[in-house]
């Protein structure tokens, strides 16, 4: 018989830098997970993606065992890295802070494709372009 999922915990943690300190420790402690076991396994799995923020979904079972799935970094993080800026615009409709090319958008869409609810690469690119516009980025050909 399959184990019953008791709780789902969603976190965004810097790759390779999970520690028992907040916010990771308290979130996992409330779920009753072995915090050190999770942090070691997460850091080992994400060591090759240093510098990125990795969303993770942790499934906690009734017997307090757990499994977790790492997702691709958020589109906003990938766009900021591609544009070389620290943060997006506070007023995206008035102030444009950076420019990204369609080639960069396509590369980000291909990276995000497994996690996006898109039928093809063109619709995924439109989603990423929308995120870029809402951050105050200009998309150029």
From Swiss-Prot:
Listed under subunit, the entry gives:
Part of the ribosomal stalk of the 50S ribosomal subunit. Interacts with L10 and the large rRNA to form the base of the stalk. L10 forms an elongated spine to which L12 dimers bind in a sequential fashion forming a multimeric L10(L12)X complex.
Q: How is it modified after translation?
A: One or more lysine residues are methylated.
Protein's UniProt name:
Large ribosomal subunit protein uL11
Q: What is the role of the protein in this entry?
A: Forms part of the ribosomal stalk which helps the ribosome interact with GTP-bound translation factors.
Q: Which HAMAP family match?
A: Ribosomal_uL11
Per the record's keyword annotation, is rRNA-binding included, yes or no?
A: yes
- The entry's keywords: Methylation, Ribonucleoprotein, Ribosomal protein, RNA-binding, rRNA-binding
| Matching Pfam families | Ribosomal_L11, Ribosomal_L11_N
Q: Which PANTHER family match?
A: 60S RIBOSOMAL PROTEIN L12, LARGE RIBOSOMAL SUBUNIT PROTEIN UL11M
């Amino acid at each position: 018989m399959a184990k019953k999922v008791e709780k789902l915990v969603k976190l965004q943690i810097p790759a390779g830098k999970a520690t028992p300190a907040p916010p990771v420790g308290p979130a996992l402690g409330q779920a009753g997970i072995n915090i050190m076991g999770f942090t070691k396994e997460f850091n080992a799995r994400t060591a090759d993606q240093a510098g990125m923020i990795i969303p993770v979904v942790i499934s906690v079972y009734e017997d307090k065992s757990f499994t977790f799935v790492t997702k691709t970094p958020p589109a906003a993080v990938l766009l900021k890295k591609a544009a070389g800026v620290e943060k997006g615009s506070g007023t995206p409709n008035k102030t444009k802070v950076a420019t990204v090319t369609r080639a960069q958008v396509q590369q980000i869409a291909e990276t995000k494709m497994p996690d996006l609810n898109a039928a093809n690469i063109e619709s995924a690119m439109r989603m990423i372009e929308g995120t870029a516009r809402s951050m105050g980025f200009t998309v150029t050909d």
